[in-house]
Design a protein with these regions (language model features):
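Surface beta-loop-beta hairpin patches that serve as ligand-binding interfaces in beta-rich domains
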Residues: 379-383, 891-997, 1006-1011
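Short, acidic Ser/Thr/Gly-rich low-complexity loop/linker segments typical of extracellular
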Residues: 1-31, 157-204, 356-357
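Beta-strand/beta-sandwich contexts
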Residues: 269-343, 357, 384-413
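Short glycine/acidic-rich loop motifs that flank beta-strands on beta-rich extracellular proteins
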Residues: 432-436, 448, 454-457, 502-503, ...
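Right-handed parallel beta-helix/beta-spiral solenoid domain characteristic of secreted/periplasmic
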Residues: 353-357, 441-529, 554
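Acidic Gly/Asp/Thr-rich repetitive segments characteristic of extracellular carbohydrate-active
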Residues: 400-432, 934, 956, 961
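Predominantly extracellular beta-rich ligand-binding scaffolds that present long acidic/polar faces
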Residues: 687, 717-933
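Right-handed parallel beta-helix
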Residues: 516-527, 541-554, 568-593, 608-622, ...
């Protein structure tokens, strides 16, 4: 009850006692005397406001078993009612029409009871009161983000976990019916009153049964009070999980709830300066493609061509990255032009230009001729030359039957009715179903308006999915992987896909039957939990996942797309999932989250040889494991990660060190009996923009390589190639703000730009000497000495003297302005980062370095541009390489200034990774293409062009070299060739970042110059 731990001058828990009296009564003026003499007394209760005295007609439950009135022993001296007489009415007071017992009789009220007190006996007299409405159960709750800290001194949780404000909280009964909906306040607190149970007289001290309700935090859907339809709650925050827990509630008691939630997205929770993961202003975005044959499909043209209609997304409302919070002069949302522009541009199908019949900002009519074939449709604006990453596949003819799914119909029914090779066309609409793709079919949406909604509401959706999965497996429609049968979930329950239940799209297949046609294309996929957006279990060879907007999904091991299993083993070791040759292309993968494993956005697990992740926009994803944006875990040889935008992703875990804010390559740990990891296989990471990613609890803000090599050593060496990447403005809590390398012994790093990356020295592995002061870490590129077991497998011994390493190969790279900080608890009231730039201290730059090597050991870059080339080979250049527009990381509000401190706020009473870094800008800014005055132009070497054909083009797919020698860095300078128009302002009065998409044209100017990094150690 609410009055525990209190002293009150009155009734406590309804109990009372008399141990004295005044002879002659209160008005006699007598003296109070201790002890009560044996006598007959009358005890009266005063009924408080809001309560009523229980009378014969006040029976409140008229169902259940009937009980006979117990005959009492006269020796018990049961007190009798002696109040005023009243007439019992004919009907029950709470149930009109139900006859009262003793109807019409005169009965005494029970507010006064006659008590016969005898020597040596107790004489209790209980009084029974009620309210017409049963006494409510009271709730007081608190929402916290367990992966973020509060740095606002005005907040009640300052120095503790961050409390997300204004989230919807829904209470459901066992049928799933919503009982109440409330909202948290600005500090994450909420309260509610809930109906109590009807069950009484059970075998418990109170006699009252608890009522069980499910509490759903950040509940996405509510009933529209006007229409009665289910609508999205306007306070639902898609950056956070929808977490449901069951609690018990008692009438009249207050239940205190601690209800944490987990972010789906990187940098979630802060209403101000939100992460900008929408396409830039004036970028063409396809909303829908249609034709007379239905959707992005035309029957094979014979003779003349066939028309298709391409509709743009038009003007789109998006979160404003310049919104400062309540009271901001900038609006919370802004509008961006995602139309096609008034000036005619270009439409290509599989690289061939289509004839334009009509062009407007909203719609294009184009002709598909008989020469054209099925392929990728892309639109390029005529006014600025921009081409978006998100296109759509247009099918010219079909090898099988064509199925059409209209809005309101079932996609799963179409899959069930299709045969291998069939094309399933899905119209725009909100399809709230969890799909199981178990056939070799093409699942084709009309565009991002066709939404596969993975939210499991109502609860029957998950039940139907379980039934469907069990039925398909029992019928032999798909096979499980070795060792997958009878695996329990985290609660010990055995069922199929226990740890990844209900992804929005589950892909399964039979063993030894590789897909020939399977494709998932042209959808928005959102709202999933546990299983994530798309989960490919196994035997998914040759699957294509393309042109989808995959947003706000969460999974136990990955948020958006996952291939295979990170930890599945059998007696032979890690299980090969047989997901080879999967192609993940032209998707917008934004603000998804994974709780474990690797890859908040995309997760590649053991057995995905020759996968390709190309031309995707991967932004704002979060992982509590490795790899905020992309995670490759286990052995998958021959993978490619190319031409992607990997922006503002994050990984963080308070309890352990996790690496790779943008991209992580991680070999699976050795199994019992093994000494070395199986490794990762060889992987190429090329022509990516890797910007603004954060490894808050470990190494490798942009890229981390861990346990790449292992069991293959002595016979072979897996090789990692880093070519043509712009790795800029990333942050690591430990070493390697740009890239961290550990147990990777054959790495080729050629023609990359590592610029303005930071190491904050705030992760727990940086606190070598204790929690008061950390050790500064290497920022640009950090190479860690391989484990002794790896060296032994290579036939080498640990280095004893200073060495100059020929691994990794470092050629034609820019390393500039990569800063190193460390934490000092003596700085400011709660500690801070050093150097103190605001206090006049100069930044410390740390471009390259070795970890755990003898003092004096060095890497051996050649033809590289370094902040300081002192001590390196003569082919290197020191100084400023001069790019179009660079900037330093800054505060979340990224005030433009020439210098500034990194500011941090700890979770004061916690250990592990107790410092959480917050920074900005979190919108596209800067342009790291070479300026015309750059000393990097024609300063490189051509030695590797004949070895690696990938290097014959730069990050913009322009020919290298442009002249006699290659330029240093990812960009090959072309004066005036295909210049990007630079940043285009939003309708709100702020700039929107510049630079073209990788593969879409050369350098251009624009952006802001920001020099302050704020590590809000919240």
């Amino acid at each position: 009850l609410r009055n525990w731990n209190q002293i009150r001058p009155g009734v406590f828990d309804g109990g009372y006692a008399f141990d004295s009296y005044i002879p002659g009564g209160w008005d006699s003026g007598g003296t109070e005397t201790s002890g009560l003499p044996a006598a007959t007394y009358v005890v009266e209760t005063a009924v408080p406001a809001g309560y009523k005295l229980v009378k014969e007609e006040d029976k409140n439950v008229d169902f259940g078993q009937e009980y006979e009135v117990m005959r009492t022993d006269p020796l018990l001296n049961v007190p009798v009612c002696v109040g005023d007489m009243h007439t019992v009415p004919n009907q029950l007071s709470l149930f009109p029409g139900v006859a009262s017992r003793y109807a019409g009789e005169q009965r005494p009220l029970c507010d006064m009871k006659q008590v016969k007190l005898e020597d040596g006996r107790n004489a209790p007299a209980d009084f029974f009161l009620f309210t017409e409405a049963p006494v409510a159960a009271n709730v007081r709750g608190f929402i916290t983000d367990d992966l973020d800290n509060e740095g606002n001194p005005q907040a009640p949780t300052f120095g503790e976990k961050y409390a997300p404000p204004w989230l919807p909280v829904s209470f459901h009964d066992y049928t799933g019916r919503e009982i109440a909906r409330v909202y948290s306040d600005e500090f994450g607190s909420y309260n509610a009153m809930l109906p109590p149970p009807f069950t009484n007289n059970i075998g418990s001290p109170s006699g009252v049964s608890p009522q069980m309700y499910e509490v759903c935090i950040n509940s996405p859907y509510m009933t529209d009070p006007a229409s009665g339809n289910l609508i999205k709650d306007p306070n639902f925050d898609p950056q956070y999980s929808n977490t449901c827990l069951v609690f018990q509630f008692m009438p009249g008691a207050t239940t205190y709830l601690d209800t944490p939630i987990i972010p789906k997205a990187a940098n979630a929770g802060r209403g101000q300066f939100p992460t900008d993961c929408e396409f830039p202003h004036h970028t063409p975005v396809i909303q829908k493609v249609d034709s007379a044959d239905g959707g992005p499909y035309v029957a094979k043209p014979v003779g003349g061509g066939k028309e298709i209609m391409i509709y743009s997304a038009g003007t789109v409302e998006v979160p404003n990255p310049y919104y400062e919070g309540p009271g901001s002069s900038n609006p919370k949302t802004t509008f961006r032009d995602h139309g096609f522009g008034a000036a005619q541009g270009v439409v290509t199908l599989d690289g061939d230009k289509l004839k334009i019949l009509e062009w407007s900002a909203d719609m294009i009519r184009a002709e598909v001729a008989s020469k054209h074939r099925t392929g990728q449709l892309m639109v390029e604006r005529g006014d600025n030359g921009r081409q978006g990453l998100l296109g759509i596949t247009v099918h010219v003819g079909a090898s099988g039957s064509v199925h059409h799914v209209a809005n309101g119909e079932s996609i799963q029914d179409a899959i069930d009715n299709a045969a291998a090779g069939d094309l399933i066309l899905v119209e725009p609409g909100d399809y709230r179903e969890l799909l199981i793709v178990y056939k070799d079919v093409i699942l084709q949406g009309y565009g991002r308006g066709a939404i596969i909604n993975g939210i499991k509401s109502p609860k029957e959706i998950l039940g139907q999915w379980r039934t469907k999965v069990d039925k398909l497996f029992a019928q032999g429609e798909f096979d499980l992987l070795p060792g997958q049968q009878n695996r329990p979930d985290v609660f010990g329950e055995y069922r199929l896909f226990a740890n990844e239940e209900g992804p929005a799209v589950l892909v399964v297949n039979k063993e030894n039957t590789p897909f020939q046609n399977a494709r998932i294309d042209g959808f928005t996929i959102s709202g999933a939990d546990a299983g994530g957006g798309i989960f490919v279990n196994g035997y998914g060879e040759n699957l294509t996942i393309s042109n989808n907007r995959i947003i706000n999904n969460q999974g136990n091991f990955s948020g958006a797309v996952r291939l295979g299993h990170p930890t599945l083993t059998n007696q032979n070791g890690y299980v090969d999932a047989m997901n080879d040759n999967v192609f993940i292309s032209h998707n917008q993968i934004i603000q998804n989250g994974g709780l474990d494993g690797s890859g908040g956005g995309v997760s590649i697990c053991t057995g995905a040889d020759d996968y390709k992740i190309a031309d995707n926009f991967i932004c704002g994803n979060f992982s509590a494991g490795y790899g905020g944006g992309i995670g490759h875990r286990g052995l998958s040889d021959g993978g490619e990660i190319v031409r992607n935008w990997i922006l503002f992703n994050k990984n963080f875990n308070q309890g352990s060190s996790v690496n790779g804010g943008g991209v992580s390559l991680l070999g699976a740990p050795p199994l019992p009996g093994d000494v070395l990891s199986p490794g990762t296989g060889s992987v190429t990471i090329g022509s990516n923009l890797i910007q603004g990613n954060l490894a808050g609890a470990g190494r490798g803000g942009g890229i981390s390589l861990d346990q790449v090599n292992g069991q293959e050593l002595g016979q072979n060496k897996y090789q990692v190639q880093l070519f043509n990447n712009l790795v800029v403005n990333n942050i690591a809590g430990a070493s390697g703000g740009g890239v961290s390398i550990a147990d990777a012994v054959d790495v080729r790093i050629i023609n990359n730009t590592f610029y303005s990356n930071d190491s904050t020295g705030t992760s727990m592995e940086s606190f070598v000497a204790g929690p008061l002061k950390s050790t500064p870490q290497i920022s640009g590129l950090a190479y860690h000495r391989p484990q002794n077991q790896v060296l032994a497998a290579m036939g080498e011994t640990p280095p004893q003297n200073p060495v100059t390493l020929d691994n990794p190969v470092l050629v034609n790279n820019i390393f500039h302005n990569n800063r190193s900080f460390y934490w000092d608890s003596a700085t400011g009231p709660t500690g801070g980062l050093i150097p103190d730039i605001d206090g006049g201290e100069a930044p410390v730059f740390s471009d390259l370095g070795l970890v755990n090597y003898p003092q004096g050991s060095m890497l051996d870059p050649r033809y590289c541009y370094l902040t300081d080339a002192t001590g390196y080979h003569a082919s290197n250049i020191g100084g400023d390489p001069v790019v179009m527009d660079d900037y330093f990381n800054g505060a979340r509000d990224w005030v433009i200034e020439l210098g500034g401190n990194i500011v941090g706020q700890p979770a004061i009473d916690e250990g592990g990774n107790f410092i959480d870094v917050h920074f900005g800008p979190l919108t596209l800014t800067g342009n790291y293409h070479l300026a015309g005055s750059s000393g990097a132009i024609n300063a490189g070497t051509n030695d590797y062009l004949s070895v690696f054909s990938f290097l014959k083009k730069d990050i913009d797919s322009q020919k290298r070299p442009n002249g006699n020698k290659s330029d240093i860095g990812a960009d090959e300078y072309y004066a005036g060739a295909n210049p990007d128009p630079g940043p285009t302002p939003d309708p709100a009065p702020q700039p929107d970042g510049g630079g073209g998409f990788p593969g879409g044209g050369g350098g251009g100017g624009g952006g802001c110059f920001i020099n302050e990094l704020v590590a809000d150690r919240y």
